[in-house]
Amino acid sequence: MGIFNGIIEFLSNINFEVIAQLTMIAMIGIAGPMIIFLLAVRRGNL
């Protein structure tokens, strides 16, 4: 049972809100260059 308590304690200490916010910022940050790349590849025709 000791290892399970350790895992539960580890998961309860993780701040999932910060992880979600950083994930969203990364997705938004990647979306900009992706749009520019698509515009360049398709010669401006989205």
UniProtKB/Swiss-Prot annotation:
Record text on cofactor binding: PSII binds multiple chlorophylls, carotenoids and specific lipids.
Subunit annotation: PSII is composed of 1 copy each of membrane proteins PsbA, PsbB, PsbC, PsbD, PsbE, PsbF, PsbH, PsbI, PsbJ, PsbK, PsbL, PsbM, PsbT, PsbX, PsbY, PsbZ, Psb30/Ycf12, peripheral proteins PsbO, CyanoQ (PsbQ), PsbU, PsbV and a large number of cofactors. It forms dimeric complexes. Part of a photosystem II (PSII) assembly intermediate complex PSII-I; crystallized from a strain deleted of psbJ, it forms monomeric PSII before addition of the oxygen evolving complex. PSII-I includes 3 assembly factors not found in mature PSII (Psb27, Psb28 and Psb34).
GO-annotated cellular components: photosystem II; plasma membrane-derived thylakoid membrane
This protein's name: Photosystem II reaction center protein Psb30
Chain positions found as N-formylmethionine: 1
Membrane topology, Cytoplasmic segments: 39-46
InterPro entries cross-referenced by the UniProt entry: PSII_Ycf12_core-subunit
Role noted for this protein: A core subunit of photosystem II (PSII). PSII is a light-driven water plastoquinone oxidoreductase, using light energy to abstract electrons from H(2)O, generating a proton gradient subsequently used for ATP formation. Helps stabilize PSII.
GO biological process: photosynthesis
Disruption phenotype: No visible growth effect at 10 umol or 60 umol photons/m(2)/s, loss of the PsbY subunit from PSII, no change in O(2) evolution under medium light, increased susceptibility to photodamage, cytochrome b559 (PsbE and PsbF) is in a low potential state in isolated thylakoids.
Tagged with keyword Nucleus: no
Keywords carried by this UniProt record: Formylation, Membrane, Photosynthesis, Photosystem II, Thylakoid, Transmembrane, Transmembrane helix
Top-level taxon of origin: Bacteria
Listed Pfam families: PSII_Ycf12 (PF05969)
